Every structure is written in C-alpha cells, then in structure tokens.
Amino acid sequence: MRVIFMGTPDFAVGTLEEIIKAGHEVVLVVSQPDKAVGRSKALKYTPVKECAVAHGIEVYQPAKIRAEESVEYLRQYNADIIIVEAFGQIIPKAILDMPRFGCVNVHASLLPKYLSLIHI
C-alpha cells in the first residue's frame, strides 16, 4: 500500500517505524519545518524527519499544508492512504479526500474523552 505519513514529534516515530516494518511503501513523509535551536541557531530535524531520512524516505516540510502548492505536491504521490499522528497543522479537505482509502488520524489517547492538545 502506498502511504504518506504525516507527523512530527518523538511519539509519532513508533507509528512510522511500524508502518515501514509491516512492508508498506511509504512514498513520502510530511513533517513540520526544521527549527533553529541553541545559540548557534543550527537547524534541528524533527524526530519523524530523522526516522524518514534514516530509512531513505523523501521528506516534505511545508510551512502551511493548506497552501495550494502543498496540496498539489502531495497529489503527485497517488497515495492509497494518509496516516497522520501529531502533525501539528489542520489538514485541508482537499488532502483528506485525496487518497483512495482516505486519511487516518492516530491519537495517543481515547477520543473524545481525552481530547486536548496535551493528551499524554
């Protein structure tokens, strides 16, 4: 299955690793842009990007996933499914409707009971 994975922090890495281990074809990883850290303001990869790079998977880091160029960029991958975990941006309907089997959001707690931005 052709998968686009969208995520950013450490706890999303486990999900990405399991998708890869299951033998699915991860055609693209979408993560938040790298951030400047420390006095040197060196750019730091997101944990999900680090994982993708380690597996040789292409990474896309849009400032705004809602931008038309982001929507068109994702469209070219013809994904069967998009799996999202802690991506950090609201995904537009144009992307949600794109994959053949839809989009699945993985949440670290029971919904709606534990719905919040800080759910762990």
Regions found by a protein language model. Give the residues of each.
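One-carbon transfer enzymes
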Residues: 1-118
